[in-house]
Amino acid sequence: MGKSDRKLTEENSIENGVKPGKLTEEEMDAIDNSSQSKIVAIASMAKRLGLGLGSDLSQVEYPSSFIAPFSTLNFFSNNFANHFNILLRANKIENEMDRLIEVFKYSTTIHKIPEDCMKVPLNAVIGETQSLNFQTPDLNSPNDLISDNYLITEQVSELPPNTATCIYNKKEGVKALFNHESKIVFQITNVKTPTTGRKYVRFDKFDEEYDIEFPVLHSRFMRGFVEYCGEGSIKSNKSKCFVSTNYIAKPLIGGNYHAYEAKVYNGIDSKPIYKISGQWDGESKITNLKTNETKPFFKNITTTTNFTPTILNTDSSVVWGKIIQSVAQGKPINLAREKSKIIENQKTLNWAPSQFFLNLEMGVWEPKLLND
């Protein structure tokens, strides 16, 4: 049976041992030059690749018209830093319940939605890095800026794809660490991107860490939008207080985009103390379930953080420079050929982690700089 005859069946799924095929350069060029709609093009690619329910798309090469002008490495990482000042404020809060709620507030700001659900980021290559420092407004004194905040990220594994990102202020003793191992799973009418790996926030002052569980990102290309769905949580290693969150899928008719409902527990009572609800990319409200008092919780405003990059020879902007420029300008490019050149060049670097080391005891990639 040829590629063109393959059907979208569960027999072609990754769980049953059949990995996606590969598009030829001629097939990619034909898709890029076609006048057909993106939906039709996706169906055509799925058939040629032999995709089935559950197929892993993490290493699939796409035509350039389906590529976004950035890498998976920095797709999420900058968003982790944009509201870092919420954590710096939480570091001043002595009450453990109030501090937990502030960490939850930060967690609602780090979700990233691509502008075009029909395009995917470039797969980061091993050793790719990004390094930034930035200032952020002091939420306790809005006219002042807090300096010495840093973001470092590195692609520490290619198969499976694993990105390590850390945002920290060493002076304040505040750190957010994300080990982001993900895969892209074909679901026939949508694509989901589940992630594994430890993600946590640490306050040295309290010797406390909060583990964060992410919901799953769904790209609903048939409906034209992307959303997070499923359960999330935040738990402390010292306090019994925790947050349980449900990220709600938008119904076919009615409902809101990016809705969620969270419940805050003190770890003693089986009933929640607070309920927080709204839209994570918009406005939320918090209700005290004992008094039924409801008040505004948070308005997630898009911020523009002025990052100052430290450009290494492994920086994303260097690694992908030619491809990103061509894609951003809408120019056709032989993606497979250009990426092969990049991979071969990366191999000559004799890569060893430059920004992170594997903490075997904790099973996470930790930043070297904080352990020097």
From Swiss-Prot:
Region feature Disordered, mapped onto this chain: 1-25
A GO molecular function held by the record: sterol binding
GO cellular component, as recorded: cytosol; membrane
Cross-referenced Pfam families: Oxysterol_BP (PF01237)
Lineage top rank: taxon: Eukaryota
Biased composition (Basic and acidic residues): 1-10
Stored PANTHER family: OXYSTEROL-BINDING PROTEIN 1-RELATED, OXYSTEROL-BINDING PROTEIN-RELATED
Family designation: Belongs to the OSBP family.
Protein name (record): Oxysterol-binding protein 3
Source organism of this protein record: Dictyostelium discoideum
